[in-house]
């Protein structure tokens, strides 16, 4: 049987979203429940896919079916397409199955009589030129403005039939000047041109970015709705409007929306005239308004969610043009979900499943004032690496950030890229802006952990660090100049934009409570400081899945001792230097155990290569030489010897413990002593340290380091007269470790997937450099998503699945988690649930996102 590419609204229903798109499925559903919908048909998403397969052409089979359905519309309406006496006038609109407001191009095609007809016709020429032929709207807007000036009026509605007729003529001339041919007059040519334009819009740059941000596959395609026209611009007894069944900003129950008399739908959306509040429609059109309020109630009860509707009143008669689940703020989403449960319309599981976890970000961070940000124009754009809004004076070094902050100045730290040395400056800043680096760069990861706004990878910035200035969009910014950055969108603004503090309502607690009832995955946090750990606990973390010990070495009072260790010539000298650091490490760990109140804490031993810790400033090198009793030249020679061509795959992780076992011994002593002390202070807690050895690729290598750790730990426990239990596990972040997980599990008591490095090594991409070519990959349709932001299930995911399966076959009680940045990405959390991980670990401010995503994964599995 031949594939069916067209469906009348009466032939479809709400369950056919994949085929008819969201708009088409909802038009069919409204038709089925007896609402007043201008009739028409939907061209399926499969026709869009076929259009691309056929080299961006509508093939004869699909064209014939479209023509047959036009005939069916003629039979339904009693009008004839292209007829001068009784024309069937249609609109052609996109219908992607996921709502894409403002991303898809929409066309209304019409023709007709006197003022109304010329108004329709000039609109049609303008929209057809803009959307189908891609002639910019601005040329036509300029002609309209000239006409209004000439006639001494301010609004389009004040132009009469002759003015509009003249405009139509000017528009046609503009079309010919731009396109080089006459405006088409054949309705069938216009119709096919409009349908092709909607198909084309599926592949426009805005739609591609939107899809990537919202996990919508390119392969879905868009449907096209061909619908008989309802006119709101035929006179004062006509109008058009957009309304929501609840307030999309607050979630409050009640009709919210706008209405315009004698206008078409795009006038409301485009804001060319100031509309009336929806309640004022009652005075103008009492009967249509009464019917509309009834329709709103019917739709909300039917879909059991807040609805966003478009409608037209033609000579007092109501027509529904669209309904969809309305976009809403995160705050409104929580209120609506809770209210729908209280009203008996939704179950707790359904309420949890309704919330987009990614939107919770905005509840936990400062945001820009909505009106101020709407009025502002970005000066540039990077990657929205850590959400929130920041405004402050530009500084270029971490030291300056600290100094300015101490004197009460709010600052934004601008760097080419950040390194662990910049931590203190990052903490002192309102926000961080980097020229280089991606979503998992050092700046991004650390900023997310601290809950600080960060925009990374703005390659348009021309940096001049020597003179403490940078240039963006033709303007040079000096130290002390104000900028504002949006860590959610990646936008960068000149000057000051007002911000608002984050607010969390009681609805947040209710939704999170329900989520915790349903989820199976535990949620931990990546935290290196007691403050981070405390914040994560407040947001619901059940332990620490990753504590990076190297960040602790950069504190002023301990970096000197660590540098002494690096520059030592003998084991004894190294041990003496490490002995100075031991009490600091122990103190840090005690504070973390205290903050976690007996919840599990996974401590990763030293991971970065040693060159990251050595001084770069002449003054610091001289200080180190003096402390070591060496010459400056000797210290410089040691620093030079630490240089590596590929440090990511160099002398780091457990390789450091193999060559310098004394480092692992010191860290083990610190972990165990801290745990014993905290356990003694809190006998009712269970303090059970988890020691994580990073970067293993071979079971023998892991055994070598584990033996050192176990011997040291057991000696400490025996000396303290304790019976403390501890575990030693490893990070799976090298493909070979995943492939040999069965062997590695003989030594490891737990696995934690470090998916940042596992992704780098599986792809062979550097996460800090991938931004240079990923956009080209998106444009070429090679990739649809950033593999560092959304877990690659086909490659990295398969390695993880294999490692879990083989590891648990060797050691059934092996527990497995993830601590890469993917631990806070909802689709990645879903995958972790599916492959049987025990926990995910993410930055503190992503903990609620992970809790909700884990619950949704469990609910989806129950439904299957």
Task: Show which residues each predicted segment covers.
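Nucleotide/phosphate-binding sheet-loop regions of phosphoryl- and nucleotidyl-transfer enzymes
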Residues: 1-375, 403, 409-412, 419-424, ...
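Short, flexible loop/turn elements at secondary-structure junctions
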Residues: 13, 96, 228-233, 398, ...
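Short beta->alpha connector loops at strand-helix junctions that form conserved
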Residues: 41, 435-437, 456-459, 547, ...
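Flexible inter-domain linker/hinge segments
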Residues: 195, 364-395, 510-525, 532-535
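Glycine-rich phosphate/ribose-binding loops and adjacent secondary-structure elements
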Residues: 316-319, 416-427, 431-433, 439-445, ...
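Extended, non-globular alpha-helical segments
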Residues: 381-421, 472-510
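Conserved alpha/beta-domain cores
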Residues: 504, 514-864
């Amino acid at each position: 049987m031949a594939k069916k590419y067209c469906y009348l609204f009466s032939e479809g229903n709400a369950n056919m979203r994949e085929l008819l798109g969201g708009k088409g499925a909802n038009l069919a559903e409204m038709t089925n429940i007896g609402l007043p919908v201008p009739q028409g048909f939907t061209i399926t998403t499969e026709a869009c896919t076929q259009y691309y397969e056929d080299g961006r052409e509508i093939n004869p089979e699909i064209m014939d079916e479209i023509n047959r359905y036009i005939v069916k519309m003629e039979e339904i309406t009693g009008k004839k397409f292209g007829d001068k006496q009784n024309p069937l006038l249609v609109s052609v609109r996109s219908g992607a199955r996921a709502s894409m407001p403002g991303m898809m191009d929409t066309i209304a095609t019409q023709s007709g009589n006197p003022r109304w007809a010329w108004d329709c016709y000039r609109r049609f020429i303008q929209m057809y030129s803009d959307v189908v032929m891609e002639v910019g709207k601005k040329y036509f807007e300029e002609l309209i403005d000239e006409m209004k000036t000439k006639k001494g009026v301010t609004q389009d509605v004040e132009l009469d039939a002759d003015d509009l007729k003249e405009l139509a003529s000017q528009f046609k001339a503009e079309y010919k000047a731009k396109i080089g041919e006459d405006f088409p007059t054949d309705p069938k040519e216009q119709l096919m041109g409009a349908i092709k334009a909607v198909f084309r819009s599926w592949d426009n740059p805005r739609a591609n970015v939107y899809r990537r941000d919202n996990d919508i596959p390119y392969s879905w395609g868009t449907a096209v709705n061909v619908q008989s026209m309802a006119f709101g611009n035929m006179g004062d007894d006509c109008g058009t409007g957009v309304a929501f069944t609840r307030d999309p900003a607050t979630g409050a129950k009640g009709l919210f929306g706008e209405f315009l008399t004698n206008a078409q739908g795009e006038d409301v959306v485009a804001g060319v005239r100031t509309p009336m509040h929806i309640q004022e429609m009652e005075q103008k059109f009492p009967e249509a308004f009464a019917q509309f309020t009834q329709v709103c109630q019917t739709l909300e009860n039917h879909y059991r969610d807040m609805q966003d509707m478009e409608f037209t009143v033609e000579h007092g008669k109501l027509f529904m043009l669209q309904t969809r689940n309305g976009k809403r703020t995160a705050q409104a989403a929580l209120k609506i979900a809770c209210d729908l449960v209280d009203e008996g319309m939704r179950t707790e599981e359904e309420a949890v499943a309704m919330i987009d976890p990614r939107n919770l970000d905005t509840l936990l961070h400062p945001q820009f004032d909505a009106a101020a940000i709407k009025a502002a124009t970005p000066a540039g754009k990077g990657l929205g690496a850590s959400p929130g809004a920041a405004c402050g004076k530009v500084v270029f070094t971490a030291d300056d950030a600290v100094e300015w902050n101490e004197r009460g100045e709010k600052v934004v730290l601008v760097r080419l890229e950040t390194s662990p040395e910049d931590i203190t400056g990052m903490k002192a800043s309102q926000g961080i802006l980097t020229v280089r680096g991606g979503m998992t760069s050092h700046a991004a990861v650390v900023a997310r952990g601290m809950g600080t706004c960060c925009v990374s990878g703005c390659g348009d910035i021309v940096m001049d660090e020597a003179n403490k200035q940078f240039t963006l969009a033709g303007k040079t910014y000096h130290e002390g100049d104000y900028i504002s950055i949006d860590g959610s969108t990646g936008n960068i603004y000149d000057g000051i934009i007002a911000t608002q503090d984050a607010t969390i309502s009681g609805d947040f607690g209710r939704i999170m409570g329900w989520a915790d009832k349903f989820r199976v995955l535990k949620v931990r946090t990546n935290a290196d400081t007691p403050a981070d750990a405390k914040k994560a606990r407040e947001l619901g973390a059940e332990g620490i899945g990753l504590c990076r010990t190297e960040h602790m070495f950069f504190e002023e009072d301990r970096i000197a001792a660590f540098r002494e260790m690096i520059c030592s010539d003998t084991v004894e000298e190294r041990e003496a230097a490490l002995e100075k650091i031991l009490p600091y490490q122990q103190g840090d760990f005690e504070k973390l155990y205290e903050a976690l109140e007996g919840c599990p804490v996974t401590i990763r031993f030293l991971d970065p290569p040693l060159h990251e810790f050595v001084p770069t400033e002449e003054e610091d090198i001289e200080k180190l030489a003096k402390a070591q009793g060496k010459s400056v030249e000797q210290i410089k020679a040691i620093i030079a010897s630490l240089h590596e061509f590929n440090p990511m795959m160099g002398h780091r992780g457990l390789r450091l413990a193999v060559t310098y076992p004394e480092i692992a011994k010191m860290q083990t002593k610190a972990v165990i002593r801290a745990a014993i002390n905290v356990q003694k202070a809190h006998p009712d807690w269970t303090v059970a340290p988890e020691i994580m050895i990073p970067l293993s690729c071979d079971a023998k290598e892991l055994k070598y380091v584990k033996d050192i750790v176990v011997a040291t730990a057991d000696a400490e426990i025996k000396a303290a007269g304790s019976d403390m239990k501890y575990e030693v596990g490893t990070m799976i972040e090298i493909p070979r470790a995943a492939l040999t997980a069965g062997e590695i599990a003989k030594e490891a008591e737990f696995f934690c997937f470090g998916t940042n490095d596992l992704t780098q090594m599986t792809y062979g991409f550097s996460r800090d450099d991938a931004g240079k070519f990923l956009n080209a990959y998106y444009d070429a349709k090679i990739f649809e998503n950033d593999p560092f932001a959304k877990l690659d299930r086909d490659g990295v995911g398969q390695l993880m699945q294999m490692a879990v399966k083989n590891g648990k076959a060797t050691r059934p009680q092996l527990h497995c988690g993830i601590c890469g940045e993917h631990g806070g990405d909802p689709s990645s959390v879903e995958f972790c649930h599916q492959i049987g991980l025990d926990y995910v670990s993410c930055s503190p401010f992503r903990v609620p996102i992970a809790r909700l995503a884990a619950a949704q994964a469990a609910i989806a599995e129950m439904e299957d």
